[in-house]
Design a protein with these regions (language model features):
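A structural signal for short, well-ordered beta-strand segments and their strand-loop junctions
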Residues: 34-36, 157
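Right-handed parallel beta-helix/beta-spiral solenoid domain characteristic of secreted/periplasmic
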Residues: 15, 37, 41-127
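Generic beta-structure capping elements
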Residues: 3-4, 78, 90, 174
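Beta-strand repeat architectures
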Residues: 24-31, 64-68
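A common structural microfeature
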Residues: 30-32, 72, 153
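Right-handed parallel beta-helix/beta-solenoid
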Residues: 1-22, 26-29, 37-45, 79
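Right-handed parallel beta-helix
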Residues: 36, 72, 76, 107-118, ...
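Extracellular beta-strand/beta-solenoid scaffold signature
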Residues: 49-63, 90-102, 124-135, 150-158, ...
């Protein structure tokens, strides 16, 4: 992937794709997606890849494809280029919906080395948005060196899944100025809310940091 790529390209190093949506059409177990540095601005009119909870959640990227044990699907900052990829969500403001940037339902996935910034809130009542939402059935994933910052959203929000490893990730400078009179509610850096038998075990947060968030 590259900010100057095109989804009509073949997705090679010299002719990369531009969007996660196109990548999701073609990836399979064992594939490595290299994300070049630069800013990936998600436009306001881009439809969500999916919605959940009767349309309440506007899920920008639906990460539903799974790898296999020993053959993960990897979404990695390109190690051969300097700088970080940055996904800018500041234009995505769906009226009456919660924003989830990466909605994780797939298993055996690896995410590493990129930022998510500018995630918005549009609902004025009690609500929340999330950079990563991990749900039941999303198992054995590695989230590594991700920086989730300068927005209005929770960094990581886990409601289910087994054996997920959140490693050396940062969430910072996140504050909701819109809902509940701008009181900054529901903007944790990291939240693990696995309630109920069978919803998930073995999830580990290691080396993660959170600062200047609000709840």
């Amino acid at each position: 992937m590259d900010p100057e790529g095109e989804d009509t390209n073949p997705g090679t190093e010299s002719k990369p794709f531009a969007t996660i949506m196109k990548v999701q059409e073609v990836v399979a177990a064992g594939d490595v997606v290299y994300i070049n540095p630069g800013i990936y601005v998600v436009p306001a009119d881009q439809p969500p890849m999916t919605t959940t909870t009767n349309g309440l959640y506007h899920c920008v990227f639906d990460m539903s494809k799974s790898g296999e044990a020993g053959k993960p699907i990897s979404y990695l900052a390109n190690p051969n280029k300097s700088g970080r990829p940055i996904f800018d969500l500041s234009q995505v403001k769906p009226v009456g919906q919660r924003v989830t940037v990466f909605y994780i339902t797939g298993s055996n996935l690896h995410f590493k080395g990129f930022d998510v910034i500018g995630t918005q809130v549009t609902i004025t009542e009690h609500t929340q948005s999330e950079c990563f939402r991990v749900v039941q059935g999303a198992n054995d994933n590695l989230y590594e060196d991700l920086k989730l910052h300068d927005g209005m959203a929770i960094g990581f929000y886990l409601t289910g899944g087994n054996n997920n490893h959140i490693l050396n990730c940062d969430a910072y400078n996140n504050y909701d100025t819109v809902s509940e009179g701008g009181s900054g509610e529901n903007v944790d850096g990291f939240g693990c809310h696995i309630n109920g038998q069978g919803r998930g075990t073995g999830n580990v947060f290691e080396g993660c940091r959170a600062w200047y968030n609000c709840d």
